[in-house]
Amino acid sequence: MSRYRGPRVRIIRRLGALPGLTNKTPQLKSSSINQSTSNKKISQYRIRLEEKQKLRFHYGITERQLLNYVRIARKAKGSTGEILLQLLEMRLDNVIFRLGMTPTIPGARQLVNHRHILVNGYIVDIPSYRCKPQDFITIKNQRKSEAIISKNIEFYQKYKIPNHLTYSSLEKKGLVNQILNRKSIGLKINELLVVEYYSRQA
């Protein structure tokens, strides 16, 4: 399944707020909610499916990518669900987003693809690049990219940057301090349901 490129508002109306996908908030009429949920028993499969879809759309990844992350998380020591979230959160495109350098993850991915981002002084054009503690994230010395990021930073710095990241406005430099903990996830998600969804595939 390819990466979603359709209307974003339609997705958040169904799944709820997904800040990585869009900074818009879902607005549902109470009547539509009642019509869709009244007298209907939601199956456990649907609940798990929707939690899985939240991860897919929020982080902007394909079905195959998410399944691969689940498989990696299963092989690692510790809580599979928490490790899965850590893997997704440490993606370069997500780190750029969480630093406030872009308003969405698709915007961050575009910066990476266009070779505007450096990690430890080297250009990295792979959005899925897995960041590590002590990695420095900077931008190329180009007026256009600096102007875009500076504008975003001024607006999004009012939102709290998670504790595992630090951003220096003076140096225009982001730092990965450590692997994040569960409390720093910027998404309302039950990751255990996602793991259960893939229990027969991973």
From Swiss-Prot:
One GO term (biological process): ribosomal small subunit biogenesis
Ribonucleoprotein listed as a keyword: yes
Q: Does the keyword Isomerase apply?
A: no
A Pfam family (short name) is S4
Q: Which domain of life is it from?
A: Eukaryota
Q: Where in the cell is it found?
A: Plastid, Chloroplast
Q: Which UniProt keywords apply?
A: Chloroplast, Plastid, Ribonucleoprotein, Ribosomal protein, RNA-binding, rRNA-binding
* MF GO annotations: rRNA binding; structural constituent of ribosome
Cellular compartments per GO CC: chloroplast; small ribosomal subunit
Family the UniProt entry places it in? Belongs to the universal ribosomal protein uS4 family.
Q: What does this protein do?
A: One of the primary rRNA binding proteins, it binds directly to 16S rRNA where it nucleates assembly of the body of the 30S subunit. With S5 and S12 plays an important role in translational accuracy.
Listed under subunit, the entry gives: Part of the 30S ribosomal subunit. Contacts protein S5. The interaction surface between S4 and S5 is involved in control of translational fidelity.
- What HAMAP family does this protein map onto? Ribosomal_uS4_B (MF_01306_B)
* Name of the molecule in the record: Small ribosomal subunit protein uS4c
